[in-house]
Design a protein with these regions (language model features):
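Hydrophobic residue at the +6 position relative to the catalytic HRD Asp in the kinase catalytic loop
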Residues: 474-476
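Beta-strand segments within the central parallel beta-sheet cores of soluble alpha/beta enzyme folds
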Residues: 470-472, 488-489
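Nucleotide/phosphate-binding site architecture used for ATP/NTP-dependent chemistry
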Residues: 1-450, 479-637
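Catalytic-loop of the protein kinase fold
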Residues: 464-470
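Conserved kinase catalytic-core helix
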Residues: 444-463
Length: 637
């Protein structure tokens, strides 16, 4: 492993870099006050609103290119509304994971309340429309403001539920506990917990944050309209998807002759009956509603993928709820892609991967080797009835943790402040070893780079396959002490086969990509890979270490730079271009979730290069770290 750079001086509670425009300090008569961290407020509504405000502000700062202020107050001009927002800065992050206090409007009354999340959403939406010179700025605000309100309200409900029972259930597994930990959601998304169309009672049952669970809703599908595929094997023999479904359904179903069981999310089962194509199949007797049956399944962090401890498979169900930027219904090309990747790995690529990173448990992909769906009598897919059968590789003792869940702030029994499991692990390791929190955190980060990030880079370099390895798609495997020892990737949507490697991949698996729509131009692959693995995953983790006051971000940026330098020095043919890109490019392309939301884009629809809005941000590996690998700036006192 590369050596760690020397730990810099302790960083202050507010580390605020310089702001280039409108950087005057707030006037003394209307200066915001930091006070207690809003996320720790005992009132869950206040804590949830504070989280919503911070998410919106982080998005705005990143997507509009605001730099750091001179002092501890960030000024955000709102020309469309004729005012200025004064934002107290709790912590300024080189990687963008800033912490803010409640903002005020300049020149407002002294006793005016702080600006809440819903008001802030309206102000920022109006400003974005004004800057883009759109004619009706209020038209853009309607949907976003409603979804921000919904997200904040649901977050408050989740917080209240979790604070009443903060401990992990004794009957659960480490994997499920992590999946249920994302109480605040994506820290750089304006509406991370919005779930339009889900009632409060349904939300309690169907949400991982409330530790919900439910039996699956089953339908019987006539074989004449069944579509399915399987590369699932047991004892060397392929198991058909129909038999897998029968096994998961158990003995409680009474199937009509000539039909196959297909599981649905209970919310989707109700919604699908209102669709003309599905309703026609029910009316004609090609589909039969069997109702809920079997044991309870638990939603994972994606909400639509469900897990049952001890079951051989997880199920990725279609769910027409709009969650973050998309309605979460499986697409047929994604189902085929999961099977295709499983076959590709079994063609010898998985063995090469394991040989490159020997030792248990190593790194692998959580496979999606089978699926079931419904075609209409005309042979066209009936949307909303597609289900992926995913391997469940995790036993009850496997500490397999979704990275986003590991970094997420959550209540702990007997503690007044929110804290992540990462902070808990680092503190426990520091106490056990007698080392500083910063030293332990830095070593933990280096181990993560070598056990999780390096294998992902290898797959891109060796095979030309880039993974959409953002924090929610990436699982880190921990040893009993809490150190990273391996990793897993999951998601049949998130594969990028480089167009330049088409011939090589065809040689590995003839016909690859023909029906899965997985080959992507290299320039698009480079941009997406840099964002998902580089910005979202690793820089996001560095931001969490810093904003949670575990390790100075600049020290981890320097360590990451040294790791990338080593990774960029391998053989040319099998070297991923990502390390050099991150080391040498002064700016990076970054997904803009606020702008994506404002433009009403669905990330699962349309060409991969236009599904989301991307903006350009400064590369902190250059702006905060010198080429020698040492921190480039001194923190402000």
């Amino acid at each position: 492993m590369p050596q760690l750079p020397a730990q810099g001086p302790p960083f202050p509670s507010t580390v605020v870099p310089r702001q280039d425009r409108d950087s005057h300090d707030a006037p003394a008569d209307r200066a915001p006050v930091l006070g207690v961290d809003p996320l720790d407020d005992p009132d869950p509504q206040i804590a949830a609103d504070g989280a919503g405000v911070e998410n919106l502000l982080r998005c705005w700062v990143r997507e509009s290119g605001l730099a750091r202020p001179d002092g501890d107050t960030l000024r955000i001009p709102l020309a469309a509304s004729g005012t200025v927002l004064l934002v107290p800065v709790r912590y300024w992050s080189p990687t963008g994971l800033h912490r803010f206090g409640p903002p005020l409007l300049e020149h407002g009354p002294h006793d005016a309340p702080a600006v809440g999340a819903v008001t802030l959403a309206a102000l920022l939406t109006r400003e974005a429309a004004y800057s883009a010179r759109r004619d009706d700025p209020d038209a853009d605000a309607t949907e976003l403001v409603g979804r921000v309100a919904d997200s904040v309200r649901r977050t408050a409900l989740f917080l209240a539920h979790r604070r009443a029972a903060p401990g992990d259930p004794g009957t659960s597994t480490p994997f499920l506990n992590a999946e249920q930990s994302l109480l605040f959601g994506h820290p750089l998304h304006p509406t991370p917990k919005s779930r339009e169309g889900l009632s409060d009672s349904e939300s309690t049952v169907c949400s991982p944050e409330s530790r919900g669970s439910f039996p699956l809703h089953w339908i019987a599908v006539a074989r004449s309209v069944l579509a399915c595929e399987s590369a699932w094997t047991e004892r060397g023999r392929t198991v058909p998807a129909e038999r897998l479904a029968l096994s998961l359904a158990g003995n409680g179903l009474q199937l009509p002759d000539g039909t196959v069981p297909l599981p649905l999310h209970p919310w989707q089962a109700r919604e699908i009956r209102h669709r003309p194509d599905a309703a026609a199949l029910f009316d004609s007797g090609l589909l039969h509603d069997l109702g809920p049956s079997g044991g309870h399944w638990h939603p994972t962090s994606s909400v639509r993928t469900v897990y049952r401890p001890g079951a051989p498979a997880m199920l990725k169900l279609s769910l027409a709820l709009r969650i973050t930027n998309s309605r979460r219904e499986n697409l047929r090309k994604e189902l085929r892609r999961g099977v295709e990747v499983h076959r590709l790995l079994r063609s010898g690529l998985a063995e090469q991967w394991r040989a490159a990173f020997p030792g248990f448990p190593g790194f692998d992909i959580v496979r999606d080797p089978a699926w079931l769906a419904v075609d209409g009598p005309d042979g066209e897919p009936v949307t909303g009835l597609d289900v992926v059968i995913r391997h469940n590789p995790f036993g009850p003792g496997d500490d397999a943790v979704c990275v986003a869940g590991l970094l997420a702030l959550r209540p702990w029994r007997g503690q007044p402040v929110m804290r992540s499991r990462l902070a808990h692990l680092v503190a426990r390791l520091a106490a056990r070893t007698g080392r500083s929190t910063a030293a332990v955190g830095a070593e933990w980060f280096l181990r993560y780079l070598h056990t999780v990030v390096r294998p992902v880079l290898w797959l891109d370099g060796e095979a030309g396959i880039a993974l959409e390895a953002h924090q929610q798609n990436t699982l880190v495997l921990l040893d009993p002490d809490g150190w990273p020892i391996g990793g897993r990737y999951r998601d049949n949507q998130g594969y990028y086969f480089r167009a330049s490697r088409h011939a090589e991949l065809q040689h590995r698996l003839p016909g690859i990509g023909g029906r899965s729509d997985t080959f992507v131009p290299d320039e698009v692959t480079d941009e997406r890979f840099a964002y998902y693995l580089g910005v979202n995953n690793v820089l996001g983790m560095i931001g969490a270490f810093g904003s949670q006051r575990l390790v100075d971000e600049r020290v981890l940026l320097a360590a990451f730079r040294r790791f990338l330098t080593e990774a960029a020095s391998g053989p040319g043919r099998t070297r991923s271009p990502l390390p050099a890109r991150l080391l040498e490019t002064p700016t990076l392309r970054c997904k803009a979730n606020l702008l994506t939301r404002l433009r009403g884009l669905d990330e699962l629809v349309g060409p991969v290069d236009t599904q989301s809005v991307y903006v350009t941000i400064a590369n902190p590996l250059i702006t905060s770290v010198s080429p020698s690998g040492m921190p480039a700036v001194t923190p402000m006192a």
